[in-house]
Amino acid sequence: MAQTLSFNGRRRVRKFFGKIPEVAEMPNLIEVQKASYDQFLMVDEPKGGRPDEGLNAVFKSVFPITDFSGASMLEFVSYEFEAPKFDVEECRQRDLTYAAPLKVTLRLIVFDIDEDTGAKSIKDIKEQSVYMGDMPLMTNNGTFIVNGTERVIVSQMHRSPGVFFDHDKGKSHSSGKLLFAARVIPYRGSWLDIEFDAKDIVYARIDRRRKLPVTSLLMALGMDGEEILSTFYTKATYERSGDGWRIPFQPEALKNAKVITDMIDADTGEVVVEGGKKLTPRLIRQLVDKGLKALKATDEDLYGNYLAEDIVNYSTGEIYLEAGDEIDEKTLGLILQSGFDEIPVLNIDHVNVGAYIRNTLSADKNQNRQEALFDIYRVMRPGEPPTMDSAEAMFNSLFFDAERYDLSAVGRVKMNMRLDLDAEDTVRTLRKEDILAVVKMLVELRDGKGEIDDIDNLGNRRVRSVGELMENQYRLGLLRMERAIKERMSSIEIDTVMPQDLINAKPAAAAVREFFGSSQLSQFMDQVNPLSEITHKRRLSALGPGGLTRERAGFEVRDVHPTHYGRICPIETPEGPNIGLINSLATFARVNKYGFIESPYRKIIDGKVTTDVIYLSAMEEAKYYVAQANAELDGEGAFTEEFVVCRHSGEVMLAPRDNINLMDVSPKQLVSVAAALIPFLENDDANRALMGSNMQRQAVPLLRAEAPFVGTGMEPIVARDSGAAIAARRGGVVDQVDATRIVIRATEDLDAGKSGVDIYRLQKFQRSNQNTCVNQRPLVSVGDAISKGDIIADGPSTDLGDLALGRNALVAFMPWNGYNYEDSILMSERIVSDDVFTSIHIEEFEVMARDTKLGPEEITRDIPNVSEEALKNLDEAGIVYIGAEVQPGDILVGKITPKGESPMTPEEKLLRAIFGEKASDVRDTSMRMPPGTFGTIVEVRVFNRHGVEKDERAMAIEREEIERLAKDRDDEQAILDRNVYGRLIDMLRGHVSIAGPKGFKKGVELSNAVVSEYPRSQWWMFAVEDEKAQSELEALRGQYDESKSRLEQRFMDKVEKVQRGDEMPPGVMKMVKVFVAVKRKIQPGDKMAGRHGNKGVVSRIVPVEDMPFLEDGTHVDICLNPLGVPSRMNVGQILETHLAWACAGMGKKIGEMLEEYRKTMDISELRSELTEIYASEANDEVQRFDDDSLVKLAEEAKRGVSIATPVFDGAHEPDVAAMLKKAGLHESGQSVLYDGRTGEPFDRKVTVGYMYMIKLNHLVDDKIHARSIGPYSLVTQQPLGGKAQFGGQRFGEMEVWALEAYGAAYTLQEMLTVKSDDVAGRTKVYEAIVRGDDTFEAGIPESFNVLVKEMRSLGLSVELENSKIENQSEDQLPDAAE
């Protein structure tokens, strides 16, 4: 672990509690995505051409394309990518896809065909590079930008191609009999199932259609009945001897059989085994030793056996009996009559060998190949009459045609392993031997030999990553294109065309676009914080095209499997319907070239654990004994214990140390990134750990990030690999720093072609996909020396290069007036006033001005009927200023839309004619702030269509952008000049000059003073005697000029892009995007959580003075309910609280020492304290710190010492107690607390300490919602639902029951009519309220009319009778007294 600390590692050192040294480097966390897509695209062609994989393989599998007559052929030569038109940032801003144009070189060959002989000769060859659409590129962070939004392609887990043997677990048949089945799954093509039925007949099914006897399939492969039987059974021959038969003694077949009648030796006639005995292996061995060769058999023994060959009269050719026929008295008589004295029978004893194939053959109605082929044809294409040719072609195309059927290399490898075959992995179709081997293996399973497969074993499931998914998609696109090309080749004059005229790349481009835009696996990136990004990229989904569906997935697929160890995290998976179907890759896992997940292990050689690391997939691991990473070793690397806990083929066991071959690399290799961030994970219940790892992904980046006191050591890795924090690309010295960029002058890796300057642009207050704020802050200052990989800027949720999702808050576990009932959280006002949990959210609003039928819409400040007050935030172009504070209903962008002309009165016409054109009617369609949002405008972007005149605002934004680019160019130029002229003066110094600028004397020795007399631009005029030096000068000059022109060119390109108009959707003239930053303070109703699945909702914010306080007067920040811990068994949170309390205590001590040092300037005490705190082999760096670094470290540590307790290898209880003791605190971790309202101490001591709390992205502001009137559904006329639709509150069935129970008839009527869908009634109520009246009448709800209409549509005549009732006169009514 002792590595040299990076630039920020010197400011924050974590005390490391892990005891197990890590021998393997953790792979880059987004390698899964990047490696897969790079392998697919292969942008840079390697020397010797591209290998046959990825995009190259796709082209090669579809090309060459020949036309129907064979007169011409289109071949694929190679492909290349051009530079993308826009970079990542520009694509984000302009809503474009980040992609590179794909150019494919194709060769069209035209043949001359001799009409008589049919011989071909080449007539013409044309080569051309053809544009084949744009291929999306992956950004450095493993994402794609599609239409301006970041997306991630999730890897998919699916069943590996190959052959699988299984049984129905006795479910299909009432007797509970196990029905075995085999299934051959190709990568693409038809599935082949071979299965038993309840009567033990073997059937085959193709593509899950109607089943056929398996013997029909074998016949279609060209076998006859006798050949089938000889393949599956051995034969024994009964020879006639005297009045009985002799049969060869077969020891193997008789093992453990029971003898019914006496066994008699055919040669000697003696009884060797008496009837009723069991043939044990020992007894059989004795018989073999005695030399028993043959046994005596009677006619009865022959009955029930099956013939192995046809019994044929060779002279006449007459077949008496066929192979597979059963022998009984009648048939035996027939055989003996015909003079046969040898009878070959099948070795079937119905115990070790069953007669399944023989029974299937006799039950099969097809007798030969033609009938079998016809039968298969009828199953596959019902209703078409078969011919021999069509049936044969169809059968061949099913499994034996490489175009239609592909096992893939994986499938072939898996099949070879399972069936013990040795075909090359280039043989991608089925062979006859494969099908026979599958049937044989299935029959052996039925006979009780061998094991069925476990489909949930990770050896039988593989991962399809981006590259492979994309490859399949692109292949589909090319195949669609192929049909079109063939038709075009046949229909046009082939001699005159170029390859470009044949190709329409639309289908291929559409396939790519469709995949990225609407595939189930192409997902909108979860970008709440850096951890959620990383987790999303490492996700494995079993859903998606070609995968499972939620409804069909049973319990087994979702369950944790022993092979998940070190490959898939057993903890992190969603709660709910997707549980177990969506998983996360373990920290050290990687995906191999076949798509299986591999985990790393240390090799053990001669009983010593080495540092050699090998990666194994689940299949390979099964044969090894693997020790845990925490097994105790001595100094030599040998196990100290005689017996070691280890894993072998899915079982955990104790094994002697000499048997152990491998050892885990690290204790955290079994969990995923999110779970590895939970300290004391080993003390938490798994269900709560699952919630903890899921909730960390929802943590909102706070205004000020703060790294946890108690971490796990994973924090810097996540921050670095997610790309949130910026790492230096190469070593150098910081030249300039401001909030938006860092300029570093490189001091290493200085190639001639590269610029010597790295400019890092920081993202300032950008919006993430989830509306959280992405903001980067520089960590370096001018003059700092940086090495490659150092973190130079923090991103969202990172603090000094550590992931920082929340804040350390002082918590007390105690009830407080019922405000922490049911996991509620009580909070101090200090947290609100100090902005501890304040976050910034950025909302985007966009307005489009379209060209309508009545005329163009216009973005303007001139809006009808709007007061000047409402326009105060708008500039002259009608767009809001940056920095304006806006609230609900404020205008962001003024826009007017023409509305239809109203007919004019004659007077108006006259006035118009006199005074000229008055503006035609327009209505106000301005963009306004939605209800409930307050904020500040942070950015405005204006986009114009090509050729539309730009307004003032657009011009101003453009000028600003160009100034920024010019500044970049000038800074880079200045550093270049400084470097080059510095080198130039060094080269000239000490040389004698033979030429120079005007007025220079020859032959003078050059020095700094001499050269500096002239302006820099004239220094190039100096020439020196030494030829070598002179040529170096010229080389430097060339290099300098080239760099300068390259810089200028780059600047001009960017400026041209800025000034060019933008691509717009059809009909849009202009678009404005406004970004509003909203500051969200914590408030009651917000959801918060710790890292251990302990979540709760803020219930009340209490004044600081009312919160409980410690003896020194410190008030606690948060009160949590102690009852939330025992039942949930997440004790990790208590250990974390104690340990962080100790950290803060130590920090306080360090702070005091720092004060002392500032007074006395004696650093020795501070140095000894820090060295003692960080004393361990992992932190020996601290001893070598200079005074400045030490003070910086102390400054950082005085808030609280940072420590790392890795999962499964962290601090134990004694360590926590020792830390508390060292900090001068009570070892129980409990303190006396005083009531803030009375000042009295509480009755008992309370657990107080720091807990790392995170604010989750479930904020009450986003959820609270109110409506009086608003939009209504078109059909039912009821209010819409949900905040997004500005909907109403649902009043459902159970709520109706509640009002009925109370007898609240009028309230109920009001709910069901005027508050919902009584259209006339609700308008009247509104009018009445406006008038100040409070009477209303309910009418007929619209839903009643809908019901009537539905009944009518069912053919029922339904009339509403109430209009027909006549008013009865008073006297006709019956009197009550009667």
UniProtKB/Swiss-Prot annotation:
Keywords: DNA-directed RNA polymerase, Nucleotidyltransferase, Transcription, Transferase. It is an enzyme of class 2 (transferase). It catalyses: RNA(n) + a ribonucleoside 5'-triphosphate = RNA(n+1) + diphosphate. It comes from the Bacteria. HAMAP family: RNApol_bact_RpoB. This is DNA-directed RNA polymerase subunit beta. One of its GO terms (cellular component) is DNA-directed RNA polymerase complex. Its EC number is 2.7.7.6. DNA-dependent RNA polymerase catalyzes the transcription of DNA into RNA using the four ribonucleoside triphosphates as substrates. GO terms for molecular function: DNA binding; DNA-directed RNA polymerase activity; ribonucleoside binding. It comes from Agrobacterium fabrum (strain C58 / ATCC 33970).
